[in-house]
């Protein structure tokens, strides 16, 4: 499975619904605040240093970016949200586009919400998780930059976030800790994403794996 994910290549960028690929197959979307480490997580997932552009200026992703793994197997990088310098009219366009994508996209099989472990579950994070819940889609909370906290603080935050999302969304949301610096949690993330994409030999990550809340 990991070798298949490593085949991901840039496919297209969509600024509006007309530019989306045909609605078939399997897609996993990645959402997150502009400085949460979304692009870095995509690069680590695929073992590529520059698949998703990592910018020093938050909010540079201004469209839905599709990375193709196999025919009709895509990773989708959503625009980063919550960055004040993005013009309001552009924010409104993104909001309407993403809303339509979540409500109508049949190929969408799961959502990864990328959150800085030090600042999890902001309003937009909860909104994204709510989109998935409304569609009955599984979601996965990726608590990035775990290396910034000690092990005890990591586990405390993990359990707190798990409790909060369970109270709001039931058992459709899983959560794990992750660090791009130490590569903590990369295999767990691959298990989740690979399972949603239906890749050969990619079973979903099991309950209680290291880095995940039970």
From Swiss-Prot:
The keyword Cell division applies. One of its GO terms (cellular component) is cytosol. Its cofactor is Mg(2+). Signal peptide: none annotated. Mg(2+) binds at residues 39, 61. Keywords: Cell cycle, Cell division, GTP-binding, Magnesium, Metal-binding, Nucleotide-binding, Septation. GTP binds at residues 32-39, 59-63, 77-80, 144-147, 178-180. GO terms for biological process: division septum assembly. Residues 24-199 form the EngB-type G domain. One of its GO terms (molecular function) is metal ion binding. HAMAP family: GTPase_EngB (MF_00321). Necessary for normal cell division and for the maintenance of normal septation. Belongs to the TRAFAC class TrmE-Era-EngA-EngB-Septin-like GTPase superfamily. EngB GTPase family. This is Probable GTP-binding protein EngB. It comes from Xanthomonas axonopodis pv. citri (strain 306). The lineage of its organism: Bacteria, Pseudomonadati, Pseudomonadota, Gammaproteobacteria, Lysobacterales.
């Amino acid at each position: 499975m990991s070798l298949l994910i490593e085949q991901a290549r840039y496919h297209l960028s969509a600024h509006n619904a007309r530019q989306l690929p045909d609605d078939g197959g399997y897609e996993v979307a990645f959402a997150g605040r502009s400085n949460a480490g979304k692009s870095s997580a995509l690069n680590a997932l695929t073992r590529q240093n520059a698949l998703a552009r990592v910018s020093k200026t938050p909010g540079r992703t201004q469209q839905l970016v599709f990375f193709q793994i196999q025919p009709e197997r895509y990773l989708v990088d959503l625009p980063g949200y919550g960055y004040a310098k993005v013009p309001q009219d552009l924010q409104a366009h993104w909001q309407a586009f993403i809303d339509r994508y979540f409500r109508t996209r049949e190929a969408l099989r799961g959502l990864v919400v990328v959150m800085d472990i030090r600042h999890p579950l902001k309003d937009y994070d909860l909104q994204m998780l709510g989109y998935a819940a409304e569609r009955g889609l599984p979601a996965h909370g990726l608590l990035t930059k775990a290396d910034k906290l000690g092990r005890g603080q990591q586990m405390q935050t993990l359990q707190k976030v798990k409790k909060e999302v369970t109270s709001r969304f039931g058992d459709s949301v899983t959560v794990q800790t992750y660090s791009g610096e130490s590569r903590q949690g990369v295999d767990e993330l691959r298990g989740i994403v690979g399972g949603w994409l239906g890749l050969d030999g990619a079973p979903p990550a099991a309950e209680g794996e290291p880095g995940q809340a039970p």
